[in-house]
Structures are given as C-alpha cells and as structure tokens.
Regions:
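Non-catalytic linker/capping segments at the edges of enzyme domains
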Residues: 1-24
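Short, basic and Ser/Thr-rich N-terminal targeting/leader segments
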Residues: 3-4, 58-60, 90
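A general structural signal for short secondary-structure boundary/capping elements
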Residues: 6-8, 52, 61-67, 107-113
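Intrinsic-disorder/low-complexity, polar/charged segments enriched in Ser/Thr/Lys/Arg/Asp/Glu/Gln
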Residues: 12-18, 61, 75-77, 91, ...
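A conserved, well-ordered hydrophobic junction motif at loop->secondary-structure transitions
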Residues: 16-43, 51
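Residue-level recognition of well-ordered beta-strand positions that form the cores
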Residues: 18-20, 63-65, 79-81, 95, ...
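Hydrophobic beta-strand-centered segment that forms part of the acyl-chain substrate-binding groove
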Residues: 29, 45-76, 82
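HotDog/MaoC-like acyl-thioester-processing domains
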Residues: 70-72, 83-113
Length: 113
C-alpha cells in the first residue's frame, strides 16, 4: 500500500531518520506532497514510541510548518525529539532538514494507548 511504500523508504540513522524523495512522493509542482509529508512524520513518530516505550499511539494533532521545498531525489533528514509527556499523552517535535537547511518543522500531539 501507499503507507508501506513510504515506511519502506525510511532509513534509521542513529536518532534520525533519512528518506530520499522518490517520484511517487511528489505533487504536480515537483515538490513533496503534503500527504506524503504527513505520512512520513506519522511513521517516524510511531517508530520512536514503538522503540522507546513499546506502546501504540494515536495521533491527535499534527501541526506542520513548511519553511522550504523538497524536490525529487532530495535526501531528507528527520530529527524527532520528545518535548513533553504525561501518563496518557506526549508531544513530539520533528525537524526536517535537507543539506543542513531546514525544510519543515512539525509538532505532533499523541495519545498513548
């Protein structure tokens, strides 16, 4: 499926994740599509919590701030950082870079199950 294709393209490198923008990920303008971007962040956050706490999550809110464009064949680096957590929820800050230039910043609120 579409989600599986995106999940398979993510590569873990230390505390970061990398992905190469492929042709199926771009929109008609030639940049990465917003839906693909949201799915990438969802997959990264799910992996972070699966590895750290071995718990499932439900994404409550995803606030995406685009600061640049990511074109075809760009290698994006995603740095997730947990900035707050409680017994039932958490907040994750994800920064996306391409060659040390910030492309996007995403705040994700999750509910822990």
């Amino acid at each position: 499926t579409f989600s599986d294709n995106i999940a398979n393209s993510l590569v873990e490198k230390g505390s970061a994740y990398t992905v190469t923008v492929e042709p199926f990920m771009i929109n008609s303008v030639g940049t990465i599509a917003n839906g693909v971007f949201a799915e990438l962040i969802t997959q990264v956050v799910q992996r972070v919590f699966a590895k750290k706490r071995r718990r499932n999550i439900i994404i409550e809110a995803l606030n995406m701030h685009m600061m640049g464009a990511a074109a075809l064949d760009n290698v994006l680096e995603i740095y997730p950082k947990e900035i707050g957590d409680t017994r039932i929820g958490a907040m994750v800050d994800c920064e996306i870079y391409h060659v040390n230039n910030i492309v996007a910043k995403v705040l994700v609120n999750v509910q822990l199950t």
